[in-house]
Amino acid sequence: MSRVSQARNLGKYFLLVDNMLVVLGFFVVFPLISIRFVDQMGWAALMVGIALGLRQFVQQGLGVFGGAIADRFGAKPMIVTGMLLRAAGFATMGIAHDPWLLWFSCFLSGLGGTLFDPPRTALVVKLIRPRQRGRFFSLLMMQDSAGAVIGALLGSWLLQYDFRLVCATGAALFILCAAFNAWLLPAWKLSTVKAPVREGLGRVMADKRFVTYVLTLTGYYMLAVQVMLMLPIMVNDIAGSPAAVKWMYAIEACLSLTLLYPIARWSEKRFRLEHRLMAGLLVMTLSMMPIGLVSSVQQLFVLICTFYIGSIIAEPARETLGAGLADPRARGSYMGFSRLGLALGGALGYAGGGWLFDSGKAMNQSELPWVMLGVVGFITLIALWWQFSPKRSASGMLEPGA
């Protein structure tokens, strides 16, 4: 085995271990924020939605700058610094008794993510060969699902005692992850050329095809982020116990572990990436619209199952499509900018979703936020269809199996 192949092979295992620590640290804390501050402390969903949206917007909206800096200085210092900032954000969240302190803790958490997320994604693009990326992204997503349910179970158990324990555990996991990267991550460069930060940003902004794709995904993410805000609140309201939230993540883990990789393998040779993305989004949209009308936990979990299946179809295609469009001369910048759709969609989905949820409750129209999200989903589908129509994609979006 050549040294390059050996480095790629070892890199895969490093990425998998690193990803598991990050996912555990995140899901110990974040699924329980809405339960803690809305249900236990009686805050308005809008206040918590602003906090979650702020974290999302800071992490993903500034990601292009984090990626560009990583292109210039390498992945390791950015990743280690970002994970320590995330740990500081979680520690601050544990003592948050006013909205401004929760917002500040989410800002710190998002700033940390801005630094570590783009270089981590760029390392995947650097180390995994193009033909293997779709499957590797599927493996990472399966791991995300397993880590999510383990983290949510641990967080739910700790929440019985004290929310500060929840936050301390999340902070400790990110400190451990920072140490793991500081010790074992080589000083790899992300891009094929060591260009100034400004040049990397310029390459991305000049790539209209990539910019259009990223911005179109804003609507997709407005639906996707509800697994952190409105879905846990709905499960808690209907089941009458925050412990039921862990079953939502258990469902996701079971579906992902059994279906994600087989669906990705089967579909990658039969359908174009953009068609898989649109099919998944359609399933997500159709499953979300009736949620406000359900009256039993069983009905709610059936719709949540369907929503997760749509996500399983869409996510590997979305990641692979974005990675395939990145210019190797500015990988970090591209991966950072690719998060802008998540930044906008997350901010709008959290703050707008929280406001719609409160409004629906006040007007006794619980279906309002879900119907509006369904409308957003259909608008996004139309935008994706327009972008990837045969005439516009003749110059070559990615073919199946590319």
Curated annotation (Swiss-Prot):
Disulfide bonds: none annotated. The chain crosses the membrane at residues 13-33, 34-54, 99-116, 139-159, 165-185, 214-234, 243-263, 277-297, 300-320, 340-360, 368-388. It is found in: Cell inner membrane. It is a multi-pass membrane protein. Keywords: Cell inner membrane, Cell membrane, Membrane, Transmembrane, Transmembrane helix, Transport. One of its GO terms (cellular component) is plasma membrane. InterPro entries: MFS, MFS_dom, MFS_trans_sf, MFS_Transporters, Multidrug-R_MdtH. Pfam families: MFS_1. One of its GO terms (molecular function) is transmembrane transporter activity. Belongs to the major facilitator superfamily. DHA1 family. MdtH (TC 2.A.1.2.21) subfamily. NCBIfam families: PRK11646.1 (NF008650). PANTHER family: MULTIDRUG RESISTANCE PROTEIN MDTH (PTHR23517:SF2), RESISTANCE PROTEIN MDTM, PUTATIVE-RELATED-RELATED (PTHR23517). This is Multidrug resistance protein MdtH.
